[in-house]
UniProtKB/Swiss-Prot annotation:
Residues 128-148 are annotated as: Disordered. GO terms for biological process: translation. Signal peptide: none annotated. This is Small ribosomal subunit protein uS13. GO terms for cellular component: cytosol; small ribosomal subunit. Located at the top of the head of the 30S subunit, it contacts several helices of the 16S rRNA. In the 70S ribosome it contacts the 23S rRNA (bridge B1a) and protein L5 of the 50S subunit (bridge B1b), connecting the 2 subunits; these bridges are implicated in subunit movement. GO terms for molecular function: rRNA binding; structural constituent of ribosome. SUPFAM superfamilies: S13-like H2TH domain.
Length: 148
């Protein structure tokens, strides 16, 4: 292991991961994979979770990549990040750029349907019922005028 060169950037799922981190922590650099999900992926591949990802062989990295592609079948329903998709009704686990695109799509659907949440997003106001009288103000402060 000492005579091998470390790869400082490892590319998995179109994401550059830091090569100096252990596998279980490096996988969390992919959007949609947290510690718990990365643990499930690493356990299913049989790779040591504490091994530094930069020292892994090409076969191990391909094994990780292919496992990430199909790991949502191994996860229980409650662990997926997109349960009962409004369009298809499926349970999915979104990764990478798909999360951002799906969120934008959902917000656009809310805006098109003129739902209350969509209108709040459109106007740049708070969405989840927070008070807005004194907090969440944007822009420069004008100040108070003194009486003459």
């Amino acid at each position: 292991m000492a005579d091998e060169e470390i790869r400082h950037l490892v590319r998995i799922m179109n994401t550059d991961l830091q090569g100096k981190k252990p596998v279980k922590y490096a996988l969390t650099g992919i959007r949609g994979i947290g510690l718990r999900t990365s643990r499930v992926i690493v356990d299913s591949t049989g790779i040591d979770p504490n091994a530094v990802i930069g020292y892994l062989s090409d076969e191990d990295i391909k094994k990780l990549d292919s496992t990430i592609d199909k790991f949502e079948e191994q996860l229980p329903k409650w662990m997926l990040n997109r349960q009962f998709d409004p369009l298809t009704g499926e349970n999915k686990h979104l990764l990478g750029q798909d999360i951002i695109l799906t969120l934008k799509e959902d917000l656009n659907d809310l805006k098109k349907s003129r739902a209350y949440r969509g209108l709040r997003h459109e106007r740049g106001l708070k969405v989840r019922g927070q008070r807005t009288k004194s907090t969440g103000r944007r822009g420069s402060t004008i100040g108070v005028r003194k009486k003459k």
